[in-house]
Swiss-Prot record:
Keyword Ligase among UniProt keywords: no
Listed EC numbers: 4.3.2.1
Gene Ontology MF term list: argininosuccinate lyase activity
Involved pathway(s): Amino-acid biosynthesis; L-arginine biosynthesis; L-arginine from L-ornithine and carbamoyl phosphate: step 3/3
Protein name: Argininosuccinate lyase
């Protein structure tokens, strides 16, 4: 491949090959080849429309770019590190195909606004995939929540048994988190859906370009209204990484619970063989490796966010070469997020829930203590006093290995005369769950209503 520099005229000496290799980005920004061609086609059409170049020249350039796009789709394009980046590689290939007229493509354009446009397009094209994947994950969670709206389990604070809840209620909590993730990625589209092209290097151009035409051709909803901002803004990429970090944090929290709950100590759930691995030495092992990998890749995502924040934190306006370092993190995190969501969707769709074990966990853990305290409060006992009374009963129960619901009525009444025989119904896990009827509570009827509400939210996306 013939090599050239877009900026060679100013220089009298040629850089060493190893220096050029250090500055090259083609090994990663080739991922934007389709976007670079797409942006160039729109730009070439605009140049012809505005008579900045002739219509025949515009048509010839567009035809050459379309041919390159087909070769790209067919896996026939080869890029050369000596041509530094995707923009120079495409221009060299176009020149080989149509000759010197290819040099007119860069009229009224800089690589500064060109790369910003490519990057915007790349993220813009892929954000819908994230939204679709999140929708599928939420649908899977809702299907599972529907099956387990009444499956009773222990709820936890500080990883200690707290109060009985339903597994469906637990799953809906993650649905809420993923809904917020969806909303953030959806809003991310607004700042991604802006066209930088036309800002040129930093100050705009003297040519009579039509930026709105290019925006329409590329499907952008708006244009940047300040040329300095257009070439130096990477907020949309930082928003994506920040949103991805929060999403991965949510997945990681759930992964931790899946890992814990699949152990013999908990035995609440079992992951399918498709999403488990074994040991090379211990025949009995069934490891939650894929949940662990999602948890591990969360740190990778955090690192990408911090890397780009650090890169951008002291850059003067407008473009700086530091910004070449903006893409690898985004490319990697996009792949990571899509893979992690897919893994979770599959893992949850094949999960086995041990309902009896979940219910059993609520029988001897004193998680019904709050029910007794609330019961006393309804009998006129100040809650703080009721709390202390029940605390003493729990201590007695621990010492005698007797759950509250198994204590004799006389012993309960010795601690609090207000207690009557109906307390045994109150202390049942099912009663404890279904008494939580406040909005957002864990009562089965609430969970069912919430499932219906969240399904409506998903239907509204269609």
């Amino acid at each position: 491949m013939t090599t050239t520099k877009l900026w060679g005229g100013r220089f009298t000496a040629k850089a060493a090959e190893w220096v050029d290799e250090f500055g090259a980005s083609i090994h990663f920004d080739e991922q934007m080849a389709a976007e670079d061609i797409e942006g160039s086609i729109a730009h070439a059409k605009m140049l012809g429309k505005q008579q900045i170049i002739s219509e025949s020249e515009s048509a010839e350039i567009v035809a050459g770019l379309v041919a390159l796009k087909k070769e790209l789709d067919d896996g026939m394009l080869a890029f050369d590190v000596k041509n530094e980046d995707i923009h120079m590689n495409i221009e060299v290939l176009l020149t080989q195909k149509i000759g010197a007229v290819a040099g007119k493509l860069h009229t009224a354009r800089s690589r500064n606004d060109q790369v910003a446009t490519d990057f915007h397009l790349w993220v813009k094209h892929r954000l819908p995939h994230v939204l679709d994947a999140l929708t599928e994950l939420q649908e899977t969670l809702l299907q599972l929540a529907t099956q387990h709206a009444g499956t009773i389990m222990s709820g936890y604070t500080h990883l200690q048994h707290a109060q009985p809840i339903t597994y469906g209620h637990y799953l809906l909590a993650y649905c809420e988190m993923f809904q917020r993730d969806y909303d953030r990625f959806e809003f991310n589209q607004k700042h991604t859906d802006m066209l930088p092209l036309g800002a040129a290097a930093l100050a705009g151009t003297t040519f009579p370009i039509d930026r709105d035409f290019v925006a329409e051709q590329l499907g952008f909803n708006d244009i940047y209204h300040n040329s300095l901002d257009a070439v130096s803004d990477r907020d949309f990429a930082l928003e994506f990484l920040s949103n991805a970090a929060m999403l991965m944090m949510h997945l990681s929290r759930m992964a931790e619970e899946l890992i814990l709950w699949s152990t013999y100590e908990f035995n609440y759930i079992e992951l399918s063989d498709d999403f488990s691995t074994g040991s090379s030495i211990m025949p009995q092992k069934k490891n939650a490796d894929f949940a662990e990998l999602v948890r591990g890749k969360t740190g990778r995502t955090y690192g990408a966010l911090m890397a780009l924040l650090t890169t951008m934190k002291a850059l003067p306006l407008a473009y700086n070469k530091d910004m070449q370092e903006d893409k690898e993190q985004v490319f990697d995190v996009m792949d990571t997020v899509l893979a992690a969501i897919k893994i979770f969707t599959g893992m949850l769709s094949e999960i086995t829930v041990h309902k009896e074990r979940m219910l059993a966990s609520t029988q001897d853990d004193f998680s019904n203590a709050t029910e007794l305290a609330d019961y006393l409060a309804t009998k006129g006992v100040p809650f703080r006093e009721a709390h202390a009374i029940v605390g003493q009963l729990v201590l007695t129960g621990i010492q005698t290995h007797t759950p509250l619901q198994n204590m004799a009525l006389a012993d309960l009444q010795a601690a609090a005369p207000q207690i009557e025989a109906d307390i045994y119904l109150v202390l049942q896990s099912e009663t404890a769950v279904n008494r939580r009827t406040s909005i957002g509570g864990t009562a089965v009827a609430n969970v069912q209503k919430e499932i219906a509400r969240q399904y409506k939210n998903l239907e509204a996306r269609q």
